[in-house]
Amino acid sequence: MEQTTSAGYRLLEEELLPEDEPALLAVGTLYGVGVGPGDPELITVKACRLLKECPVIAYPAAKKGGKSYAHEIVEMYVDAEQKTMLGLVFPMTKDPVQLENGWRWTVELCWNELRHGNDVAFVTEGDPNLYSTFIHLARLMQELHPGVPVVSVPGISSVLGAAAALEQPLADGNQRVGIIPATEDREALKEALLHHDTIVFLKVAKVLDTVLDVLDELGLGGKASVVTKVTSPYETVWRDARKLRGTELEYLSLMVVSK
C-alpha cells in the first residue's frame, strides 16, 4: 500500500514507518565518513572502524543499484552481504522543485534507517566537509529531523593526494593557498590566480581550455600540472598542463598551479 508523506513523496508502506508511528529505538547516528581520494589504504583508522560497525553504508550512486567511486574505495573494508548498502541517487538537475524533492527523498531514505536505531555511514571521497555531497545531506537532515546526531569523520582530500603525487608542497611559510572549483568565469579565475601563491582548481575537466587560456594570459602556462583519479591505481599525472589542450579528461581531475 502506498502513502504520501508531508514532503509529497509516494512511499510503500513496508518501506517506511507511518508518519505518526514513533521510533521504538534510540535514533541512529548519521556519519559522514571521508574515505580519501582513491587509495583504500589512505582511509583513517576511525573510518575503517565505523565501516565495520555501522549496519548501513550509504553512498552516492549515479543510478539506482549502481556503485560510486566512494563505494569502490571501501569495498575491501565492507562485507556487503552483512550490511544494508544504501545507494543514494542525488538529483542532477537545475530545476529547483525537482532538486528539492530529490534531496528530501535521499534524506528520508536515510531517516528510515536512522529512526529504526541504525547508524548510517555515508561514505564520500576526500573529506566530508570540503565540497562534498554530505554537506547538503547533513544540513537537510538536521532541518527535517533535528533529533538525529550528525558526525563528520575527516578524510584525506584529493588536494593533498595531488601534492604527494607531484612531490610538490602546497604552501610554506606565509604562502597562500586557494582551493576553488574550476569555472568558465575568466575574471574569477584571474582573481584566484592573482591572490594566491598556489591554486588548486577542482573539477577542471569541463573548462580545461578556458583555464589554460587564462594561465597563458597571466604568463603562468608553465606553472600548472594536472592529476586525475588521485592516488588510485588509475592515477595519471601531467606535469605540464599545456599539453592537455583540447583533451577530454576524467571527471575526477584537478589542476595545481604553483607560482
Regions found by a protein language model. Give the residues of each.
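A contiguous loop/helix-start segment that scaffolds small-molecule binding in enzyme catalytic cores
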Residues: L30, L193-K259
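A polyampholytic, Gly/Pro-enriched intrinsically disordered region
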Residues: W103-N112, P169-P181, K243-L254
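A generic structural motif
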Residues: M85-V89, P154, A224-S232
